[in-house]
Amino acid sequence: MEKTQQQLIHEIEHIRKFLIDLGEDYPLHSHIVVSCSQKLDLLLNEFERTKE
């Protein structure tokens, strides 16, 4: 099943929220959370740019 761009954006935002919650639970690993969140931000920005 192929997902629409809007579905992918929604899933990425859900993953980001999960990562943030995980970072709060495990502060020693917050650098991993920050790195993953930044990569997801770049992906979201790319989706937004290609949507226009």
Curated annotation (Swiss-Prot):
Signal peptide span: none
Highest taxon in the source lineage: Bacteria
Instruction: Give the InterPro entries listed for this entry.
Output: HLH_DNA-bd_sf (IPR036638), Spo0E-like (IPR018540), Spo0E-like_sf (IPR037208)
Which biological processes are named by the entry's GO terms? Answer: regulation of sporulation
Q: Listed GO molecular functions?
A: protein dimerization activity
Q: Which SUPFAM superfamilies match?
A: BAS1536-like
What's the short name of a Pfam family annotated to this entry? Answer: SpoOE-like
Q: What is this protein called?
A: Uncharacterized protein BH0262
